[in-house]
Amino acid sequence: MKQNAIQPANLEFNAEGTPVSRDFDDVYFSNDNGLEETRYVFLGGNRLPERFPSHPRPLMIVAESGFGTGLNFLTLWQAFDVFVRDNPNVTLQRLHFISFEKYPLKAEDLRLAHQRWPELAPWAQQLQAQWPSAFGGCHRLLLDGGRVTLDLWFGDINELTRELDDSLNQQVDAWFLDGFAPAKNPDMWTQDLFSAMARLARPGGTLATFTSAGFVRRGLQEAGFTMRKSKGFGRKREMLTGEMAQTLSFPARVPWFARSSSDAREAAIIGGGIASALLSLALLRRGWQVTLYCADEAPAQGASGNRQGALYPLLSQHDPALARFFPAAFTFARRMYDALPVMFDHQWCGVTQLGWDEKSTHKIAQMLALNLPPDIACAVTAEQVAGLTGVDTGCGGITYPAGGWLCPQQLTAELLALAATRGLHVHYGYPVETLSAEGDGWLLNQQRYHQAVVLANGHRITGFAQTAQLPVYPVGGQVSHIPTTPRLAALRQVLCYDGYLTPQNPQNQQHCIGASYHRGNTDTTFSEEDQQHNRQRLIDCFPGAEWPQDVDISANDARCGVRCATRDHLPMVGNVPDYAATLTQYASLHEQPDIADSAPVCRNLFMLGALGSRGLCTAPLSAELLAAQMSAEPLPLDSDTLAALNPNRLWVRKLLKGKAVK
């Protein structure tokens, strides 16, 4: 995937108030009545909302080429909203809309365009509130409390459809083939696109498009659709509609990274931190019955128990998966945290990462080379750092304006309390020692049966026979709690250097400074040495500044925790792989990848772990991804990034090279 090379739409508004693309010399919607044209062509052409009452599944999936102003989406959402309000007991409960856009509108242009349709304002305002930054890849928006999911894929549709995971094959119930006219934008209307639409269309799925161009009709027929001409809208004589009347078959492209869903709709989660809490809500939203087993007597006693944690992305130019995953995870996390109906201490004050020596300065230069939008990350000079943060460091760096800090312990407790009101059953003080396969499900401690199980228990995730070989490791660390002083109180942003320092929490007038890093260590005993080390690192990184001397650790106030990490700094999200079967089945994978079967996994056993030091950033999208996978729903990441999150990845990479797995 070409990361972040996204240009915003170059448009103007004509005398009628219709947006017009300067680059394509074409209107975004009809000057006459764009709203009625959308209802006629795309909703009517796909027999929507007539199909809503008889839809056989809880989720309807609609895909579109060319999001533009979002008119098609908003019109469909309005119709869906009216339908579910009037028909609360039908099977169809949720809408998933997937759209591709090469040139996304700027937020202000989107708002101006929406003024043309006052009747869509209730839905348009929700979209505007979550409108994402313009960088490449998938932006998942959860709207209407999660009843409507919008996946906005920014980039070239002909490239993006090649990067979709196989799990989306034959899932789309209806296609809106939209975009600028074929004569104006021939690069989009390709046989590759038509073939991708056919691959993604569910048998019996439909499509509609405003054009009646012969090459479009023939191309869609060649791809597998049954096509017919219909009367066009208004002055347009004809349009095209189609149906996928056959069942096509498509071989898996990377079967060794295949993700298996679950036929169950009942699951146990083993954990008690932020990952468990977010996953509980994501599954409950999809209609699952969920039970949480926590070994501790209260939530967030592990790595999620800190008073202040920083929210910002891990950026890397060297690893494409990191470069794709973390911006998506960071922006999704902010959207989710902002939408939560719970209270927790937090400040979106920004985070600034400093180049305090030659190595860190070089690293920041590489981060900036990712060319993320400035509202995500941008360069700052030493003078700008002083202005932004309120303290003088003498260092420049990179700032994340949308970052900040939050209280993980509060957030986790509030999320689990919210989940309990939505049906979550919680058992505290219940350590799960063993997992035993029982039919298609699992027995916990030889006692409690569940149809599916998710392991989200931090560094203890390897404590089962099924996970003992996973290449993850614990990292112990101590965070120091220090009282504020007049000079420390001036700090307005989270500072990251060879450690981190938060602004004071107004609720307790304390800062957090940390954290020590002890790979392989699970000891949570207070360490005087770590306390001193946390203070000294701040002083050493900014030797010319006086204010770091104000850090007072004499009260020995600190918290020790244990993170779970991986060598490649990415979480493990997906099926628990079957270690022995993976080594046996893929012994000759490097010689015969073309005949490989799907990845061997432990049926109905999943994991969400190895979040390392960035769990606040990665847990929301990771939980959303796993809940979608378990429910056989569209996934919010491209296939390469999904492969990089697969718990079997480190083994499979070695096997693909013919190397031994140790």
Swiss-Prot record:
Its main location: cytoplasm. Residues 1-245 are annotated as: tRNA (mnm(5)s(2)U34)-methyltransferase. One of its GO terms (molecular function) is oxidoreductase activity, acting on the CH-NH group of donors. It is found in: Cytoplasm. It catalyses: 5-aminomethyl-2-thiouridine(34) in tRNA + S-adenosyl-L-methionine = 5-methylaminomethyl-2-thiouridine(34) in tRNA + S-adenosyl-L-homocysteine + H(+). One of its GO terms (biological process) is methylation. It holds the Pfam family DAO. Its cofactor is FAD. One of its GO terms (cellular component) is cytoplasm. Keywords: Cytoplasm, FAD, Flavoprotein, Methyltransferase, Multifunctional enzyme, Oxidoreductase, S-adenosyl-L-methionine, Transferase, tRNA processing. Catalyzes the last two steps in the biosynthesis of 5-methylaminomethyl-2-thiouridine (mnm(5)s(2)U) at the wobble position (U34) in tRNA. Catalyzes the FAD-dependent demodification of cmnm(5)s(2)U34 to nm(5)s(2)U34, followed by the transfer of a methyl group from S-adenosyl-L-methionine to nm(5)s(2)U34, to form mnm(5)s(2)U34. In the N-terminal section; belongs to the methyltransferase superfamily. tRNA (mnm(5)s(2)U34)-methyltransferase family. PANTHER family: SARCOSINE DEHYDROGENASE-RELATED, TRNA 5-METHYLAMINOMETHYL-2-THIOURIDINE BIOSYNTHESIS BIFUNCTIONAL PROTEIN MNMC. This is tRNA 5-methylaminomethyl-2-thiouridine biosynthesis bifunctional protein MnmC. It comes from Klebsiella pneumoniae subsp. pneumoniae (strain ATCC 700721 / MGH 78578). The gene is mnmC.
